[in-house]
Regions:
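Aromatic/hydrophobic beta-strand junction motif of beta-rich domains
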Residues: 46-52, 145-151, 246-252, 345-351, ...
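Short, solvent-exposed loop/linker segments at the N-terminal edge
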Residues: 34-44, 132-143, 234-244, 333-343, ...
Length: 538
């Protein structure tokens, strides 16, 4: 400033800044979840960060078109933050940011953002084409099964399947097909066992949903543990029976739900029934023919796996009736009368089939019985007592059992063991004179022999001549008679009697007798002392 006097004076310098504008450098949705910087969040209380020049001294925000404003807070030079204090509704929103600097300049910027908190819960199911057992039982015999994923929202960006098998866990990616449907198929074959699958879906907003776990069992095989012919008779386990209606028992794993059987080469099938113990049984309702048969068994488990096994078996209902006879060499009496004088007689057993596995003889004697098992020797069946039998009657019955369990009995054979006989009495029937003195005046003596009733032959011989004559059985049992047909000479004689019984036993006895046919003619005279007249005149 200069006055009239010419004085000049200077003020202190004044620096003035002309600032006619400000700016908003950036607006950031801090809790942008999911894909970064897509301004999509699942946070219902979004957090914003505004970057502005350092001279900005006020930042405010509005999401209702400027009707309502909230003030951001400066957190560092040029950085302002605000977290919404109340829930922001789902959907698209426009954020308006207004910044004011110290010069009073203002600027506004907008940012579109979306709040998305919804995501459907995914579903996973075994593909029906691979659900090989009962539909919906989550059991499959496919070792690389396909799973269908449903309820997958269109904004899903990650779809994975977690597979837990034993202690092994892996996370695998699902695949979206050309038709838009999601599915999952393992890259390699799964071993048999249980698998638990859980689907995890993440959308663009970062929402995550998991399906309920699905437990699936992979079962690619089954088995038939055993087939048993229940009415296997005879030798156990040889699959030989005499039952025309065989009964079978099939043992399988517990998950088998169908067992069927066939006897005609798989043309016709019948279904077995599972008992309370988990074993499958079937009794053939009609007669099955004699001979060899092949049983085919097919088992199907819950996963649809099948197993087949066969059993060869034979039905044998035939067995010959055995025959027992006394050995002819020991049939010592009349042939075929089964009476023997042998105390350890031999018996021949015939009509024994080749498949006989047990042959026994039951011997009944005097109210008791015992059984002896026989062994075939030299192709023959034979029985001889191991100790001498006492005299008496014995009944022998042969029992034969074959490999199929058939049993046949012989007709009982009654045998009598008789090892001795006797001559009870020899009588000279025409014993004249003094009784029983065996003195007769008959030139043709008559004899009576008393013997046991089983004696079949009585013969007589005189004086050791070696000539024998046969007596004749009398009307009374045990009495035999013989009258000599020709004259026997005077004097002493010895009669020899030999008897033979039905068993062939013999006994001999002798009788001494005498024939006396002579007697002098007697003479009588008067004693001479008393002959008083002429001597000799009587």
């Amino acid at each position: 400033v200069e006055d009239k006097a010419g004085n000049v004076s200077h003020s202190a310098p004044l620096t003035v800044t002309v600032d006619t504008q400000t700016a908003i450098n950036s607006i950031e949705l801090v809790n942008d979840t999911g894909i970064p910087d897509d301004n999509l969040t699942n946070a219902v209380r979004p957090h914003f960060r505004v970057t502005v020049p350092d001279d900005v001294n006020a930042v405010r925000l509005s999401i209702d078109g400027g009707k309502t404003w909230v003030d951001a807070k400066r957190t560092s030079a040029g950085v302002w933050d605000y977290s919404w204090l109340t829930d922001v509704t789902e959907g698209a929103h426009t954020l308006t940011v207004e910044a004011t600097d110290v010069a009073g300049n203002t600027v506004k910027e907008t940012m579109s953002f979306t709040v998305d908190t919804t995501l459907s819960v995914p579903l996973i199911a075994l593909d029906s084409a691979d659900d090989s057992g009962v539909r919906g039982d989550e059991l499959t015999r496919v070792n690389r099964p396909t799973f269908l994923l449903d309820n997958i929202d269109n904004d899903a960006r990650h779809v994975t399947v977690e597979v837990q098998h034993g202690s092994t866990r892996e996370v695998l990616k699902a695949t979206q097909g050309a038709n838009g449907r999601w599915s999952f198929t393992p890259a390699g074959d799964w071993a048999d066992g249980q698998y638990t699958l859980t689907v995890k879906v993440e959308d663009e907003a970062g929402n995550i949903r998991q399906s309920a776990p699905l437990t699936v069992t992979v079962d690619t095989q089954t088995a038939i543990d055993g087939i048993e012919l229940v009415n296997d008779h005879g030798i156990s386990g040889d699959n030989l029976t005499n039952a025309l209606r065989p009964e079978f028992r099939v043992t399988t794993p517990g998950d088998v739900n169908t067992v069927r059987l066939s006897l005609d080469g798989d043309t016709n099938w019948v279904n077995a029934t599972k008992n309370a113990a988990g074993v499958w049984e079937y009794n053939w309702p009609g007669d099955v023919g004699e001979g060899k048969h092949t049983l085919t068994v097919e088992a199907t488990d819950a996963a649809g796996n099948t197993a087949t096994r066969t059993l060869e078996f034979t039905i044998d209902t035939t067995l010959s009736v055995p025959v027992i006879t006394l050995d002819s060499a020991d049939d010592s009496g009349n042939r075929g009368d089964n009476v023997t004088s042998v105390r350890s007689p031999g018996f021949t057993i015939e009509n024994i089939d080749p498949d006989a596995n047990r042959v026994t003889v039951q011997i009944a004697h005097d109210g008791s019985s015992r059984e002896v098992e026989l062994t075939q020797t030299g192709g023959r069946w034979h029985f001889t007592p191991d100790s001498a039998w006492t005299d008496g009657s014995y009944t022998l019955t042969v029992k034969v059992e074959d490999n199929a369990g058939n049993i046949r009995y012989s007709t009982p054979l009654d045998v009598k063991v008789d090892t001795h006989t006797s001559i009870n009495h020899i009588e000279l029937v025409n014993d004249n004179g003094v009784p029983d003195d065996n003195l007769t005046n008959e030139m043709r003596p008559q004899f009576r022999v008393t013997v046991p009733e089983d004696v079949t032959v009585v013969r007589l011989s005189l004086d050791g001549s070696g000539d024998w004559v046969n007596a004749t059985a009398g009307a009374t049992k045990g009495e035999w008679n013989y009258s000599w047909p020709s004259d026997v000479g005077e004097g002493k004689h010895v009669l020899t009697v030999e008897v033979t019984d039905a068993a062939g036993n013999t006994a001999t006895k002798a009788l001494d007798f005498r024939i006396d046919t002579r007697l002098s003619e007697p003479v009588i005279t008067l004693n001479s002392a008393d002959d008083t007249g002429v001597p000799g005149d009587g």
